Amino acid sequence: MFLLHILAIGACLLWYFVRSDKRKQGSNIPTIRRWPALFPEFLDRLSYNSCAARLVENGYREHKDRPFRLLKMDMDLVVIPLKYAQEMRALTSDELDPLTAVFDDNVGKVTGILLDSQLHTHAIQRRLTPRLPNIIPAMMDELNYAFQQVIPSEAGERLQTSWVPINPYDMVLELSTRAAARLFVGEPICRDEVFLKTSAAYSRNIFDTIHVSRSLGHIITPYLGSLIPSVRQFHQQFEYIQNLVLGEIAHRKQHSEDNKADDFLQWCMELARTKEESTPTALAQRTVGILSMAVVHTSAMATTHLLFDMISNQELREQLRTEQKQVLKQGWMGITQQTMLDMKQLDSVMRESQRINPVGEFTFRRIVRKPITLSDGFQLHPGQQIAIAARCINTDGDVLPDAETFKPMRWMEKESAASTGFAHSSDSNLHFGLGRYACPGRFLASYMIKAIISRVLFDYEFKLQDDSAAGRPPNLIHGDKIFPSRDVTVLFRRRHDE
């Protein structure tokens, strides 16, 4: 790893001098730096990942109502104020490009994520979301099976009387993988244990690779893949998963007149409009990429954050259990879309958890494609990457009263339940994005998180392994990303209602 960092420094120096003239546009924007002005800017780029959260907070505090610039390893990031959001949310993708921004943010040159069209968005918006009432039973059936597989029978027996140590992140990742696989590739693949274990490991290695790449920079990481364990592993895992999905695509095309599957892969096959979108390889890559990144891992992180928020608050857990019993009079397997909507207290806790512990500092990442002049005369130039400092805005006391305090029922106090729901995108709930390109899968994610948490509340008591440990397990911060701890052990025990 030391050699990799030396190479990173050399590459960053070369990139800095080659690209310095190309970064003149927007030079009137104030730059938030860690190092004094007499030091070269490449030092700020090298140290961005170690102090990004502090830099964002400083920039937001000093320039709340005007843009400021951050110096990242791969490019400059122009952080724009919330006042521009309403103007920009209506702009089209040929003016503000969300796909390339997501591609860059996910180290697309290394991981192959994400993709070069909006096919996955169309599949989610036109097929998945309208079908949610009918999809929920399949998700619940798979989660019921998944809980039996993820918590082995021997552990299940011990759980009846004893506390059993479980890694909550790994548990939730496996549950999410199994449930999402049912909806994305269907049976029999979703019950293939090798596929499931490989998919979960693939998700972990993708994020480990992104973590490494943000330290080394996007310029040299693609050339050092053979030296990075997570890169080698996820390429091998992706090849296996892709071949399995390719076989399923071939089977479906050969039996196209039979009963068609009703899953994400099939929807993409039917909605593909170009030759490039229709190729089996592109369909497989899109399905695997969205399954791993947009659904499984983000749902797993949000659910783990939520478990950690509840772990030191027995009163909150009991309050949520009471709601579950009131809403689910037919038991956990009786969950429907309506009962999901009736879980208003859980929904409030989910939204508050995401407000305090989001997946990252920013939302609304875009690459500027055309010159844009905003209403106050501020100009955006082609090639600039922009974002909104969502975490800072949503924890700003001037925007939200008592913003630094975690108040689980904060959103129950609001008048309009629809506008304060977990999956509702708004200026006060920025982490799903804004406008026409807000996260299309947020409704599915909401239901999956609720279903998993509901089962945990119904069936288990849980606490930190170390009884002396107090409070919430700390987050892991890397650059502008926020992760729940993946190493914390939580003790679970089966509940026995009196």
From Swiss-Prot:
Heme binds at C439. One of its GO terms (biological process) is secondary metabolic process. Pathway: Secondary metabolite biosynthesis. Disruption phenotype: Abolishes the production of all paspalitrems, but accumulates paspaline. Its cofactor is heme. GO terms for molecular function: heme binding; iron ion binding; monooxygenase activity; oxidoreductase activity, acting on paired donors, with incorporation or reduction of molecular oxygen. SUPFAM superfamilies: Cytochrome P450 (SSF48264). Keywords: Heme, Iron, Metal-binding, Monooxygenase, Oxidoreductase, Signal. Residues 1-20 form the signal peptide. Its EC number is 1.-.-.-. It is an enzyme of class 1 (oxidoreductase). Belongs to the cytochrome P450 family. Cytochrome P450 monooxygenase; part of the gene cluster that mediates the biosynthesis of paspalitrems, indole-diterpene (IDT) mycotoxins that are potent tremorgens in mammals. The geranylgeranyl diphosphate (GGPP) synthase idtG is proposed to catalyze the first step in IDT biosynthesis via catalysis of a series of iterative condensations of isopentenyl diphosphate (IPP) with dimethylallyl diphosphate (DMAPP), geranyl diphosphate (GPP), and farnesyl diphosphate (FPP), to form GGPP. This is Cytochrome P450 monooxygenase idtP.
